[in-house]
Amino acid sequence: MPVFTHLNENNEVHMVDVTPKPDVSREATAKGRIYLRPETLAAIAEGRVLKGNVLATAQVAGTLAVKQTWALIPMCHPLPVGGVTIWFEQTDEYIEAFCRVKTYGKTGIEMEALTGVSLSLLTIWDMVKSAEKDEAGQYPVTRIDGISVIEKIKGTPE
């Protein structure tokens, strides 16, 4: 049976005490995709979106989200964010977002990477939603999926 560290011996939710753990370098990378209409993808690539530079805005939004993860996820520890790198790869069907986060601390930083990639993708959607809607106001093509942690690195204590 799996162990859920956020439940105490009375099966009550609590924030895990990480104070006895040593500080070590940590890194996590997450990715996810947003599927868009070909015309929208072309407009993004050619800088023709009226709201501005979609990918630059998504990078900023993702970075801000990384720094606020502790305030959004109840049992997530506030961590000193040492660095955030967000980048995108575009195909003729989707944009794939990547978010790498680094820290030096007592617990992993994968929730921050997942939050960063998620908000980057949501920001892309928000900036192009007017072009993605059909006549009925629905989004027949637009979807976000495949959000996952693709790498997690934990250093060793000194």
Curated annotation (Swiss-Prot):
Source taxon at top rank: Archaea
GO biological process: one example: Mo-molybdopterin cofactor biosynthetic process
Catalytic site positions: D126
Catalytic reaction annotation: (8S)-3',8-cyclo-7,8-dihydroguanosine 5'-triphosphate = cyclic pyranopterin phosphate + diphosphate
GO molecular function: cyclic pyranopterin monophosphate synthase activity
One Pfam family, short name: MoaC
Positions annotated to bind substrate: M75, C76, H77, M111, E112
Enzyme class: lyase
Metabolic or biological pathway, per its Swiss-Prot or TrEMBL entry: Cofactor biosynthesis; molybdopterin biosynthesis
UniProt-listed SUPFAM superfamilies: Molybdenum cofactor biosynthesis protein C, MoaC (SSF55040)
Record function comment: Catalyzes the conversion of (8S)-3',8-cyclo-7,8-dihydroguanosine 5'-triphosphate to cyclic pyranopterin monophosphate (cPMP).
Homology family: Belongs to the MoaC family.
The protein's assembly and partners: Homohexamer; trimer of dimers.
Record protein name field: Probable cyclic pyranopterin monophosphate synthase
Gene behind the chain: moaC
